[in-house]
Amino acid sequence: MNTGIPKRSARMDMGFYALNKLASAGIVVLLLSLLDWAWPSGADQASEWLGLYMPQEHWVYGYALTASLAADAILTFLPSLHKGKQAAVYGAVGFLFFALFTGGHPEQLWLRAAAGTLTLLLFLWGKHAFSSNSLATPFFALAVPLLCWVI
């Protein structure tokens, strides 16, 4: 039975998936930039607390995006899960990824892991919030990170 909805190709689905991930990263970059603008010494203070001294772009696009892709890969091997269980998987991946792979001082392990969990939960929110037919998706994927970088 034809429902009138055209079927998309696998390439188009992958493109929308990538755009969704970039939009989620854009939200995280925007929130970190707003925190940096509202509290100018906050970025240095947060880096000191976490024991990491890297630009926020590396944190978001290097670590968080990779961890989000790993969480999605794990979710593909599991049966369909409710949003709460998806959040648990994302949180666990964020916790482990940021605790184990970001280096830094071991004293800040729990803070890094908690920050990774919160960051990945924002990626999960973006996964559900950004749709393929919304203009907000390309805006947050492309325009917001560029504006945050320029300003």
Give each language-model segment a name.
Residues S134-I151:
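Final/C-terminal transmembrane alpha-helix of multipass membrane proteins
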